[in-house]
A protein has these predicted regions:
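Short hydrophobic "strand-cap" motifs at the C-terminus of beta-strands
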Residues: 17, 149, 187, 214-218
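Short N-terminal targeting/anchoring amphipathic segment
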Residues: 12-15, 66-98, 105, 110-112, ...
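Charged active-site motifs of nucleotide-sugar-dependent glycosyltransferases
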Residues: 11-14, 209-214, 243-244
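N-terminal subdomain of nucleotide-sugar transferases
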Residues: 1-49, 53-72, 77-83
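Conserved donor-binding/catalytic core segment of Leloir-type glycosyltransferases
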Residues: 191-192, 205-224, 230-237
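Donor nucleotide-sugar binding/catalytic pocket of nucleotide-sugar-dependent glycosyltransferases
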Residues: 142-203
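Active-site proximal beta-strand in glycosyltransferases
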Residues: 102-121, 136-148
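Nucleotide-sugar donor phosphate/pyrophosphate-binding loop at the beta->alpha transition
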Residues: 119-138, 162-172
């Protein structure tokens, strides 16, 4: 067997559940599907009404999954996923419950945390609804592994989770935090870097210049603090420090 056939034989079908499929979530999912050696199939919902996606999106995603399994001519060994990859906007326990009659019980499940509803900066004047943080938490309990997109994200979640769970009078899951932490890890979101010709330095004469490249790969929203980013750029510029952007 040659290397190409071995590589092909190892490929598996993965269902990627994306309940809020827009912006960075869609870019990440699409990039993974394009570059993975596996057959990554996207099951998605439009990126709007985020609260409703977390509350009711599991039903629509389950219906899409069942439609794939029941498609004319579909054979179970061809269409059943070898693994499930779900984003944080998916109510994972609800989806797994709805799919319990259709998926093998041992199907591995990975939860990918783009963000969470416990430490996510809340708009000024609005009160945080802990319902959605609990959906995140129970999804972590249901997953075999939990990936966070940064070390800061992971550490801030596990620093705050015990304070969330202490709100509840009994059976408060505090004993589960350590177990979930042990199966959590950091998996940064990949990016498509620009070509040298399209990433000419600000203040640099040509593509052979070597100032450091500063990359902003976040949404242009209040919670990402673009004001601080620009303040830093202003300081670098005022100091005469060369950089590329």
């Amino acid at each position: 067997m040659n290397a190409a056939s071995t590589h092909k034989a190892e490929a598996r079908t993965i269902w990627l559940l994306s309940a809020y499929h827009t912006g960075s979530h869609a870019a990440w999912a699409g990039g993974y599907a394009r570059h993975s050696r596996h057959n990554v199939q996207l099951l998605t919902l439009d990126g709007r009404f985020w609260k409703w996606r977390m509350q009711g999106g599991a039903r629509a995603l389950a219906a899409e999954a069942v439609a794939r399994l029941d498609a004319p001519g579909a054979q179970p060994h061809d269409v059943l996923p070898a693994a499930i990859l779900a984003t944080d906007m998916v109510n994972l326990p609800a989806w797994l419950g709805l799919m319990r009659r259709r998926l093998p019980a041992a199907t591995p499940v990975l939860l990918y945390m783009h963000e969470n509803q416990l430490t996510y900066p809340w708009p000024a004047g609005e009160r945080r609804d802990l319902t959605y943080a609990m959906i995140n938490w129970q999804s972590m309990l249901a997953a075999d592994a939990v990936a966070f997109n940064s070390a800061f994200h992971l550490e801030s979640w596990f620093a705050e989770a015990p304070r969330l769970l202490k709100h509840f009078p009994d059976y408060n899951h505090l004993a589960d935090v350590a177990a979930v932490r042990r199966r959590a890890f950091v998996l940064p979101a990949a990016i498509d870097t620009p070509s040298p010709a399209s990433s000419r330095a600000i203040g640099a004469p040509d593509a052979t210049s070597t100032p450091p490249l500063i990359l902003w790969n976040q949404r242009w929203e209040y919670d990402k603090r673009p004001d601080r980013f620009f303040a830093l750029l202003d300081r670098l510029d005022a100091a005469g420090t060369p950089f590329r952007l």
